[in-house]
Design a protein with these regions (language model features):
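Classical eukaryotic N-terminal signal peptides for Sec-dependent ER targeting/secretion
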Residues: 1-10
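Catalytic-core signature of thiol
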Residues: 4, 14-318
Length: 318
């Protein structure tokens, strides 16, 4: 059947008469090396793509661009399963902290060597675990000068009793609480599978980084988030279930997303462009998404653009 679909695509691509939408879909399939096993799936994916195509065409922003990416043939339900930040379960930490005011105009922890390469959570709602490991990787580097890629799968498999649900979602603060009790091992030692596991595979003695404490950044304060970022990468939650984020390709998001938090990411810096301030955010959808796996989100007081000021936390490590 795959050969039938391939032949169908090849025939369509060579046809002299093809409407613009059909041609756009064929180009998309080729560019993203998509493969559909049945005629029914082909038609389903095409319908999803055409819906995305309409949203992208209707989008208008002076500060950012959006375009087709790996998610353009996904259904809305499939995409929502990626968004695993369980805002309804969050209990604010008893420890809050207002960092000293930062006077630095630009901070970028990538250039300092504190950020690992962009990872890919795949079709699993494990964003919270990637946000957690990113914050721990940064804190450990700042404390020791050693950059380690830490295991998201350990957090997924082993922090159930702290309220996390693997691919079903979780919270960064809950993962920090787990990492107080058990050090986190490396990605190489405990590789990512993007799957539910009912048992914990952590091997005692292999842990590398343990949380000594963590704090929640002052709520709804753009300045407090900026000051925290100046100290190191910060786990943040945002609303990602909007075309402005799903199909983001470049620029600064200044509108088009709400504040209903559903996705855990990592703030790794800040700066400004043409007078527009932004936060540099590392996503976990692979390096082909956005600006090489990153997104710049505009700065605003209150909950912030995409809710970025609403649920930020930062760990310290042993």
């Amino acid at each position: 059947m795959r050969s039938f679909i391939a032949a169908t695509i090849a025939a369509a691509a060579s046809a002299t008469l093809m409407n613009g939408e059909d041609y756009a879909f064929i180009q998309y399939v080729a560019e993203h090396a998509k493969s559909y096993g049945t005629v029914e799936e082909f038609n389903f994916r095409k319908a999803n793509f055409l819906a995305a195509h309409a949203e992208i065409a209707a989008f208008n922003s002076a500060t950012q661009t959006i375009g087709h990416n790996v998610f353009s043939d996904w259904s809305a339900d499939e995409f929502k399963k990626l968004l695993g930040y369980r805002a309804q379960d969050r209990i604010p930490s008893q420890s809050t902290f207002t960092p000293p005011k930062s006077n630095a105009a630009v901070v970028d922890w990538r250039s300092a060597g504190a950020v690992t390469p962009v990872k890919d959570q795949k079709a699993c709602g494990s964003c919270w675990s990637f946000s957690t490991t990113g914050a721990l990787e940064g804190a450990h580097f700042i404390a020791s000068g050693e950059l380690l890629s830490l295991s998201e799968q350990q957090l997924m498999d082993c922090s159930w009793k702290f309220g996390n649900l693997s691919c079903g979602g979780g919270l960064m603060d809950s993962a920090f609480n787990y990492a107080k009790t058990t050090p986190i091992t490396t990605e190489a030692q405990y590789p990512y599978t993007a799957m539910f596991h009912t048992s914990c595979g952590y091997v005692a003695g292999t842990g590398k980084v343990q949380v000594s404490s963590y704090y929640d950044v002052t709520l709804n304060s753009a300045q407090a988030l900026k000051d925290a970022i100046a100290l190191g990468p910060v786990s943040v939650a945002i609303q990602a279930n909007e075309p402005a984020f799903q199909y983001y390709t470049s620029g600064i998001i200044t509108s088009g997303c709400g504040t209903s938090l559903d996705h855990g990411v990592l703030a790794v810096g800040y700066g400004s462009e043409n007078g527009v301030e932004y936060t540099i955010v590392k996503n976990s959808w692979g390096p082909s998404w956005g600006e090489s796996g990153y997104v710049r989100i505009g700065v605003a007081e209150g909950a912030g653009i995409c809710g970025i000021n609403s649920s930020a936390s930062q760990p310290q490590t042993n």
